[in-house]
Amino acid sequence: MTLTIYNTLTRRQEPLETVEPGKVKMYCCGVTVYDYCHLGHARSYIVWDTIRRYLIWRGFEVKYIQNFTDIDDKILNRAKEQGSTMAEVSNRFIDAYFADIRRLNVLDADEYPRVTEHIPEIHQLIQILEEKGLAYAVGGDVYYRVERFPSYGKLSGRELEQMQAGASGRVDVEDSEPKKQHPFDFALWKAAKPGEPAWDSPWGQGRPGWHIECSAMIRSKLGATIDIHGGGGDLIFPHHENEIAQSEAAMNQPLARYWTHNGMVMVNGQKMSKSLGNFITIRELLDGVGSWKGDPVNPMAVRLFVLQAHYRKPLDFTEEAIANAENSWKTLKEGLLFGYQYGEKLGWGQESAIIPELATRFQELGDDDFNFSGGLAVLFELAKELRREGNILVHEGTTKTPSDELQRQWNTLVTLGKVLGLEATPDDETLTQPGLSDTDIEALIEQRQAARKNKNFSESDRIRNELQAQGVTLIDSPQGTRWHRS
């Protein structure tokens, strides 16, 4: 089977052929650290974490780099508002990033380079562009000559004449027009302003432009050409377009073999924004505070919600959608916990194979442009079967399904679940939710049976309703009462 990826640059799905066979160099644009991460960030970093996990499962050696933009107008504005420094704001929200994103079971990248730690590398790259005639200095600023890069616009599919200044709100809108030789030239270096952090440079004191930062950090950490460059779809233009212009003009090599972008997160069909009042941060959602008016949401339910849609498609966040994801996670979690609850009783050994047919189907889906939403169907097939077997074991004490077959099913579920970052253990408070144990449920059913025997039907109904509120469905029959979790 061949792993294929949709390439934004070529607008088609292509086989993954890395620079060095068996190894993947991957870079994803990180956050500008001036605020808490929101649902859009959650989607991006869950997606790239899962792609990384999948590539490793497929046998690749992956080096994954994700930067922090720790110098930016938004950071400076936040520092002024709070009466603090740029470094204090950056460090605070870098710590917050890790606190929030790790709750979603996102693995740490191999490295997190910061812009402020790569000023010399940025200077060097600008000087190369200047020597090649693709950059010019004026009044302490340095700009990129867009017209000197003939293929500018190849990633976004735009002609230079059709482009609009200020796209994504990040194209040097603070630069005065007379400084530029062309209206679409963009800043590589910005002259110092009073009261703002600045670094010495060949062009005088100043700070880097936004786009040059990623080009310099990629070159420093991964070399001239990487395999996969990831990010949100809103970064295609101008940020990624400008990265290509800078890096490829300087190095005379492709910056990335594959450009891959995840879709945007909508809230009730609208773009998420503070002005619309639908801006939700990760910690608000997980803790049930602030803009999120509902109950705290399980982190694994958030991860499941993200993976239920193909990564390139828009994702609409609604209360109903997240509630459905929570219910789906309960089903999956019950399957993932099956081995912990019944493995000893079934006499399982330490080692067990996975079911090759299911692993193959999962891989076929994943190899098709990371179709993790399709792969989830394999997990739910296993989880539902294990939940059914668990109910049989509770009620009858034994099952007709061979023990070794159940162990293979469970091991397959756990193995493939880990590929998607969907994991649960009995002792992990972040991955499990409080609720009634099997023993609690059986005790309540006995109380209900006693109430029915005494014709106390109001008490019987109360217990049924209590169990139903806890996600437990009762099935009465002449042979007795059976139950299952919803």
Curated annotation (Swiss-Prot):
Spell out the reaction equation it catalyses: tRNA(Cys) + L-cysteine + ATP = L-cysteinyl-tRNA(Cys) + AMP + diphosphate
Sites binding Zn(2+) sit at 29, 214, 239, 243
Please tell me which stretches of this chain the record labels as motif 'KMSKS' region: 271-275
InterPro entries from the xrefs?
Cys-tRNA-ligase (IPR015803), Cys-tRNA-synt_Ia_DALR (IPR015273), Cys-tRNA/MSH_ligase (IPR024909), CysS_C (IPR056411), Rossmann-like_a/b/a_fold (IPR014729), tRNA-synt_1_cat_dom (IPR032678), tRNAsynth_Ia_anticodon-bd (IPR009080)
* Hydrolase as UniProt keyword: no
Q: What is the cofactor note? A: Binds 1 zinc ion per subunit.
Q: Name one GO molecular function term.
A: ATP binding
GO cellular component terms? cytosol
Pfam families documented for this protein: CysS_C, DALR_2, tRNA-synt_1e
Q: Any idea where this protein resides?
A: Cytoplasm
The portions of this protein that span the membrane are none
EC number(s) reported in the record: 6.1.1.16
Cofactor(s) listed: Zn(2+)
- Amino acids binding ATP: 274
Which EC class is this protein assigned? Answer: ligase
Q: Which family does it belong to?
A: Belongs to the class-I aminoacyl-tRNA synthetase family.
- This chain belongs to the protein called Cysteine--tRNA ligase
Species of origin:
Trichormus variabilis (strain ATCC 29413 / PCC 7937) (Anabaena variabilis)
Q: What is the lineage of its organism?
A: Bacteria, Bacillati, Cyanobacteriota, Cyanophyceae, Nostocales
Gene coding for it: cysS
